[in-house]
């Protein structure tokens, strides 16, 4: 896409990509999202969203996750927090091409403060924003490390997992019986 001078994010999404985006949207929040809001976010009709949600529910949800529907309120996914995080991680891991990983590692190891990495399946979600914040923080941590000993696959896993954990913790979604401590208690 760079050779053709076309940003791959400008191309309309097919059903598979729309379903990934819908999953990410629904998994990063605890609130219901209306069909119209999802349609506007993906630039498709509400009927397309309804069809995609049916396919998502029948073919893409892991056992233990449930797509909930409520008239005039919207849609949301419920299930065990571990499954929610694993599903998000799986979507993000499968999205990266070899070129994306190369570009991401270059950005992580010697990128500038204003450089930005776009995640196609997480566009316009909290994951996109947090992912780039984590890149900047990790870059500062890696400044003093011996880069020859780094395992890029592990770096990518850490980057994705810290992003997911941060987004989910901001929504007060913890694994097990852990509880968030209020800042006043610290």
Q: Predicted regions span which residues?
A:
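A cross-family "folded-core" feature that marks the main globular domain of proteins
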Residues: 1-186
């Amino acid at each position: 896409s760079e050779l053709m001078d076309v940003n791959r994010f400008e191309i309309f999404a097919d059903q598979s990509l729309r379903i990934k985006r819908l999953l990410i949207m629904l998994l990063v929040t605890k609130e219901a999202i209306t069909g119209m809001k999802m349609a506007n976010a993906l630039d498709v009709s509400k009927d397309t969203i309804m069809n995609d949600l049916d396919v998502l529910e029948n073919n893409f949800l892991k056992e233990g996750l449930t797509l909930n529907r409520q008239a005039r309120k919207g849609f949301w996914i419920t299930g065990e927090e571990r499954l929610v995080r694993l599903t998000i991680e799986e979507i993000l891991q499968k999205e990266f091409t070899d070129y994306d990983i190369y570009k991401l590692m270059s950005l992580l190891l010697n990128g500038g403060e204003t450089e930005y990495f776009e995640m196609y399946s997480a566009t316009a979600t909290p994951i996109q924003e947090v992912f780039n914040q984590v890149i900047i923080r990790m870059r500062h941590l890696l400044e003093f490390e011996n880069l020859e000993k780094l395992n890029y696959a592990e770096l990518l896993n850490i980057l994705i997992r810290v992003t997911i954990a941060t987004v989910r913790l901001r929504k007060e979604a913890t694994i097990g019986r852990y509880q968030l401590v209020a800042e006043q208690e610290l």
